[in-house]
Amino acid sequence: MLMHSILILLVIIITTYFTRIWPFMVFNSKNPPNDFVRYLGRALSCSVIGMLVVYCFKDIHVLKPPYGINEITAFLSVILLHRIFKVFVLSITLPTILYMVLVQSHALEKAFFNIHVS
């Protein structure tokens, strides 16, 4: 059983490694990407962000507490941080951490709606 788990982990590690390194092997300085691939790189980044926003807000129930306050707080922190610093990694990482803390601690529910979660 342990050997089976180790083999599964190795396959996952190797597969992940090759999917990450593959673009660098295919598109190097000798073989730059064509215009279509460059276009996809620009267009898909915006599409992925849009998809993540929809995914973030899909389970909000606006008619019952906590009314999506955790999601809205994290979303507003993304906008604020990106307007101030204009650093994508910071704009994504800190609000993600904020959202996780808010969801797991139920801090906003306790503060604004007097909801006590055990």
UniProtKB/Swiss-Prot annotation:
Cellular localization per UniProt: Cell membrane
Membrane-spanning segments: 6-26, 43-63, 84-104
Q: Which Pfam families match?
A: AzlD
For this record, an example GO cellular component is:
plasma membrane
What are the entry keywords? Answer: Cell membrane, Membrane, Transmembrane, Transmembrane helix, Transport
Bilayer topology: Multi-pass membrane protein
Q: What InterPro entries does the annotation carry?
A: Brnchd-chn_aa_trnsp_AzlD (IPR008407)
The record's family statement is:
Belongs to the AzlD/HI_1737/HP1330 family.
Q: What protein name applies here? A: Uncharacterized protein jhp_1250
Q: What species does this protein belong to?
A: Helicobacter pylori (strain J99 / ATCC 700824)
